[in-house]
Amino acid sequence: MSSHLNWMIIRNNNAFLVKKRNIKKPFSKEPNNVTNLNSYRYNGLIQKKAVGVVENPDRKGFTVVYKKAKATNKPAKNAVRRQFKAGARRSLYKVKRLLKANHYRTDLSKATLRRASAILRSQRPIKAKKPKAAVAKTE
């Protein structure tokens, strides 16, 4: 089946949709959707080439999951997982090179880099805040 026909089938009704009141466009929780928007362009289920970013279980780095266009009819061989733990700048540079080498769309690669950097930012240790001078004097 074509991706357009698949989209027409799953567009308004699938297990990954998140519909809420006062939100015009529903969100999506599907695995390879980097923007979490329910749209044909970013849908990870129907596109031949899709990319997703997930956090590593040990909270050190992230994993990029991408689909190979050649193995569309073989779901077991379709997904490729690559872990990145080298450090923030180096990992993001490697992801950028990976997506460029596999000829992914630029909007997908930008969204992927944004998601990966958000994951790395969430893994940073939280700095202890110093007490303010006024509060310290009164105690």
UniProtKB/Swiss-Prot annotation:
Spell out the family assignment given in the record's similarity comment. Belongs to the eukaryotic ribosomal protein eL28 family.
Pfam name, any one: Ribosomal_L28e
Which GO terms of the molecular function aspect are on file? structural constituent of ribosome
Q: Which UniProt keywords apply?
A: Ribonucleoprotein, Ribosomal protein
Biological processes annotated in GO? translation
- Xref: Gene3D superfamilies: 3.30.390.110
Q: Which InterPro entries match?
A: Ribosomal_eL28, Ribosomal_eL28/Mak16
**Any one cellular component term from GO for this entry?**
ribonucleoprotein complex
Q: What is this protein called?
A: Large ribosomal subunit protein eL28
